[in-house]
Amino acid sequence: MIRGIGTDIVEIERIKKAIKSNPNFINRFFTQKEIEYFKLRKFNANTISGNFAAKEAVSKALGSGFRGFGLKDIEVLRDELGKPIVNLSDKLYKMFNLDNYNIFISISHSNTDAIAYAIIEVI
């Protein structure tokens, strides 16, 4: 059963400016594993923007936006084929009673924008 869907679009230039103007931007909003992935991608703004949009999309699919939790509670990584995967913090498991669920996420970008779409399925 589908529990929720969410989508988000981010201007890549806005993320570039945030990274330049705030040296703590990446550490504030992304987990250590995400930052390690960004290092492999040479801190590409498209990649960072895509992850940011994915976190927003998942929060919308949860139905709450970011109320009672933060961006680091949603971790967006890649599997061995490069497919984005989502890990949620224990806090979110408890907040939303997510015992048996799947999160499907799609991330794409153009030269100017990154977009993500999330579906949460309860099994």
UniProtKB/Swiss-Prot annotation:
Any GO BP annotation: fatty acid biosynthetic process
Keyword Transcription regulation attached: no
Pfam family, one: ACPS
EC number(s) on file: 2.7.8.7
Residue sites binding Mg(2+) per the record: D8, E56
Coiled coil: none
Role, per record: Transfers the 4'-phosphopantetheine moiety from coenzyme A to a Ser of acyl-carrier-protein.
HAMAP family: AcpS
Name by which UniProt lists this protein: Holo-[acyl-carrier-protein] synthase
Organism: Clostridium botulinum (strain Eklund 17B / Type B)
